[in-house]
C-alpha cells in the first residue's frame, strides 16, 4: 500500500492499524533546535482520545506517545530539542477487541472501505477496518503537534458548528466555551441542544453527521503558490483525507454560489499597517496564496457507518446477506474530528511555510 505520506518540505508518514500492536508517524523536514517533548504532543492527543464522554466510542486507549527518534538534549541548555532528522512517534494500541468483528469478517460493511480495499489489494483487515479506521488519525494529531511548533505566531483552532440539522448561533461564538462541553462547541446553548439530541441518536444505536470549522489566525500573506500548489488546494486535500469526510469548503465556500460579485468580493482600504480587507468571504486565500487574514475551512463528516440496525450487503463469496455491526463506535465521528482537522491544517501551514522560505527566503 502506497500513499501513506503527505507534504513536501514538512512530510508526514503514518503507519499502523486499528488492531495492530501500535500506530505512529514519522515526521521528516522539521527544522532543528525546536524544543520538543512528549508532553508537547500529549496534550493534543488527549483532546482526541476516545472514551472521554458517552458521545464517543468507549474504546479505552491512553494514547501515550513515545518519541523514538529525532530529538536530543541541547549541549548547552540541556533542553530536549529537534535535531533536524526524522522524528518517529509511536502510540501503542492497548484495548483491541478483534473478536467483535469475527462474525463479519467475510461480509462487507455498508459505508465502510471493506469492499474497496479488497477490490484493490485482494486482502483487507476486517478487525476494526485496519488502516481505514479512524484510529489512524491519532498519528495525524501527533504530527500536528509538531507542526504547531514550526508555525510559531500562528494559531489553529477548530470547533464543531453543526450536528445533524442543528447549527450553532454564530452570534454566540465563544472560544472559551470549547472546553466546557464534550462537543468542542463554541455556543453554550447549542451544546445543550446537541446533548439531548445526540443522546437520542446514541440510545437508538444510530449515528449522525457533523460539520467542523477550522480557523488559522496569524497566517502571514504569501503562503501558497499558484496553480498546482495552492494553499487552499492542499488544505482541501488534507481535510478530505480524514476518515468519513465527504465535503470541504474554504471561506464562504458553496454559499458564494448565491452571492453577487458585489457581495462576494473582499473590498480593501489602507489600514494602519498597509492594505486591509473589509470582509473575508475568501477565507484568507486568493489565487491559492494567503492574504494575511484568518484562513477559514469547513469540512463535513458523514454519519458513522457502523450502526446497530441490520443492513443488507453481500459476502466475499458473492451471496446476498444481512449484517449487524458490533463493536464500539462513535455516534458522531465529527466530535473527535475537531483536533484531527486542526492537525491537518497545521501540517499544511508548516509545509507551506517551509516551502515559502525555501523559495523566497
Swiss-Prot record:
This enzyme's EC code(s): 4.2.3.5
Entry annotated with the keyword Amino-acid biosynthesis: yes
Alphabetic keyword roster: Amino-acid biosynthesis, Aromatic amino acid biosynthesis, FAD, Flavoprotein, FMN, Lyase, NADP
Annotated GO MF terms: chorismate synthase activity; FMN binding
Binding site for FMN: 131-133, 243-244, 287, 302-306, 328
Reactions performed catalytically: 5-O-(1-carboxyvinyl)-3-phosphoshikimate = chorismate + phosphate
One of the GO biological process terms: aromatic amino acid family biosynthetic process
GO cellular component: cytosol
InterPro entries, alphabetized: Chorismate_synth (IPR000453), Chorismate_synth_AroC_sf (IPR035904), Chorismate_synthase_CS (IPR020541)
Protein's pathway: Metabolic intermediate biosynthesis; chorismate biosynthesis; chorismate from D-erythrose 4-phosphate and phosphoenolpyruvate: step 7/7
Binding site for NADP(+): 48, 54
Keyword Lipid biosynthesis: no
Cofactors (names): FMNH2
Cofactor note: Reduced FMN (FMNH(2)).
Subunit annotation: Homotetramer.
Biological role stated in the UniProt entry: This reaction introduces a second double bond into the aromatic ring system.
Family according to the record: Belongs to the chorismate synthase family.
HAMAP family with a match to the protein in the record: Chorismate_synth
Listed name of the protein: Chorismate synthase
Lineage: Bacteria, Pseudomonadati, Pseudomonadota, Alphaproteobacteria, Hyphomicrobiales
